[in-house]
Amino acid sequence: MTKLKDWPNQERPREKLLQKGTAALSDAELLAIFLRTGCRGVDVVTLSKQLLSQFGSLHALFAASESDFCEKKGLGQAKYVQLQAVLEMSSRYLQEPLSKGNALTSAAQTKAFLIAKMHNLPYEVFAAILLDTQHRIIRFHEFFFGSIDCATVHPRIIAQKVLSENAAAIILVHNHPSGDPSASEADKMITQKIVSALQLIDVRVLDHLVVGHKKCTSFAENGWI
């Protein structure tokens, strides 16, 4: 078996990244850089391909429990801890521009933050970004958990929080653990109920984002709000 050190420079993941950028690398090559080394008889790129095949995707590998992660050949508790640290740093990096007092100036940045924050959750969460009159962030607040439907989402509770924080506008968001960001009819009904309730206190709902795996659906962009 050819060892990784014997590969041409342009085919080694680290050298390829430096020459062509991160977008040029496959999932297996990116994972290989994270793992750094393979195991007996298996180079790190081959090991990465095997792990992706076993888990099904990078998303599934990242979301794996400690026990499921550590039982795989070539992994272990040290790698699990390292991965969790990387994921948390990524989340904080995306969240930093969306901290209290900063204005929302980019829809893409907002989506990236919400996807990073919510796409791995194994249960549904209904939340909102509360904004002041200049669309500066007051806070991100999680309202409801579990199966999200008209019976569990109460516009009155959202209105109370909005009033207590003196918010002028909000962006609604909830996740679909299935990974499918498509908005259901129930999602649209809930949104309309909240929009109607907040109109009574002169608070605008700027958007409702449905977060799936690596992407989200915007009610505003689809003309549903």
From Swiss-Prot:
One of its GO terms (molecular function) is metallopeptidase activity. A motif (JAMM motif) lies at residues 174-187. InterPro entries: MPN, RadC_JAB, RuvA_2-like, UPF0758, UPF0758_CS, UPF0758_N. Zn(2+) binds at residues 174, 176, 187. Residues 103-225 form the MPN domain. GO terms for biological process: proteolysis. The keyword Metal-binding applies. CDD domains: MPN_DUF2466 (cd08071). Keywords: Hydrolase, Metal-binding, Metalloprotease, Protease, Zinc. SUPFAM superfamilies: RuvA domain 2-like. Signal peptide: none annotated. Belongs to the UPF0758 family. NCBIfam families: PRK00024.1, radc. This is UPF0758 protein Ping_0056.
